[in-house]
Design a protein with these regions (language model features):
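Cationic, histidine-enriched alpha-helical/coil surfaces that engage anionic ligands
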Residues: 1-150
């Protein structure tokens, strides 16, 4: 006998279908996302080479994905207003990883100066892409009140 994903029991003692049973966790996921976005460093604190600020952005990306999945389960459809911010955070993650890889490669012992220079330029370019992705996220984030919360 085959079960559809919507028919799989969620936990022992859980009654009802998935959308009803997951309403409260979905609301919690949204609250966590809004809190994470509100905690992001402000624009004026942004520096292109500040890797210490990457962590909160990665956390916001993970929580956005969790919120999108919960939204799809509870409401049966994805929220199109979150596609742009989600894409921006994906680009952010890619640029952060590329910058870190370039920096690590540049620290290789006995690397040719020209190669080290090229990797440094690549690192700088990727850190600027990080800032560009953050700006796109801020522009496309549909809940502007969360961006200005203290």
């Amino acid at each position: 006998m085959a079960l559809l994903a919507s028919d799989v029991p969620l936990a022992p003692g859980t009654t009802g279908r998935a959308p009803e049973a997951l309403l409260e966790p979905a609301e919690l996921a949204e609250q966590r996302l809004l809190a994470a976005v509100a905690a992001l460093p402000p624009d004026d604190a942004a520096e292109p080479y500040n890797e210490a600020q990457d962590g909160p952005w990665h956390q916001a990306r993970l929580l956005l994905r969790l919120h999108r999945y919960a939204h799809e389960v509870v409401l049966g459809t994805s929220d199109p207003s979150l596609a742009g911010p989600g894409h921006a955070l994906d680009l952010h993650r890619d640029a952060v990883e590329a910058a870190a890889a370039a920096a690590a490669a540049a620290r290789t012992p006995r690397i040719a100066p020209a190669t080290a220079y090229a990797l440094g330029v690549l690192h700088a370019d990727q850190r600027h892409e990080v800032e560009a992705a953050r700006a796109v996220f801020r522009e496309t984030w549909p809940y502007t009140a969360a961006m200005t919360a203290p």
